[in-house]
């Protein structure tokens, strides 16, 4: 199906790329939007500090689409349902933007794992194994975006690929 298609005779499909490569949600005929992990509740953002996503630009575009979506209720997978998704989308956008700046600033001839380690140390807590894997994936997505934007360079070093802010 494509975004906007009616699925099963009643659900309108939503394109929610960003958290995952091909994530979708649905809007019911009575205006309830099931938005999955495309937007997280503020308590989840505060608790974890690193939302999982695989495509930074698409995650931001999805937040834009959610803000423009007409629905009476938005139901995220993690967080309470809300009638107005805009404050939640803005909170998610702030966290993503801040994380991008932080990762860019940590690109000082560090490996990806060095960047993840520096972020973990700065937060003052150690991630469990699952959180560590999710954190690495999000940092990898940001490094890809920063490389595409020409804001960092990558080079080979004895410890592996290292990233340097331009």
Predicted regions and their residues:
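Metallo-beta-lactamase
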Residues: 10-100
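Alpha-helix-centered segments that form part of catalytic cores
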Residues: 1-9
């Amino acid at each position: 199906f494509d975004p906007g298609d009616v699925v099963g005779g009643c659900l309108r499909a939503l394109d929610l790329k960003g958290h995952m490569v091909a994530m979708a949600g649905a809007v019911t005929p009575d205006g309830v939007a099931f938005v999955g992990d495309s937007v997280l509740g503020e308590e989840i953002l505060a608790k974890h500090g690193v939302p999982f996503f695989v495509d930074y630009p698409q995650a931001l575009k999805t937040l834009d689409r959610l803000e423009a979506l007409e629905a009476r209720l938005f139901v995220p997978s993690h967080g309470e349902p809300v009638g107005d998704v805009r404050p939640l989308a803005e909170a998610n956008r702030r966290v993503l933007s801040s994380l991008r700046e932080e990762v860019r600033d940590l690109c000082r001839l560090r490996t990806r794992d060095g960047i993840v380690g520096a972020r973990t140390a700065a937060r003052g807590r150690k991630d469990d194994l699952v959180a560590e894997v999710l954190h690495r994936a999000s940092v990898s997505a940001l490094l890809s975006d920063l490389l595409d934007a020409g804001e960092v360079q990558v080079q080979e070093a004895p410890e592996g690929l290292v990233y340097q802010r331009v």
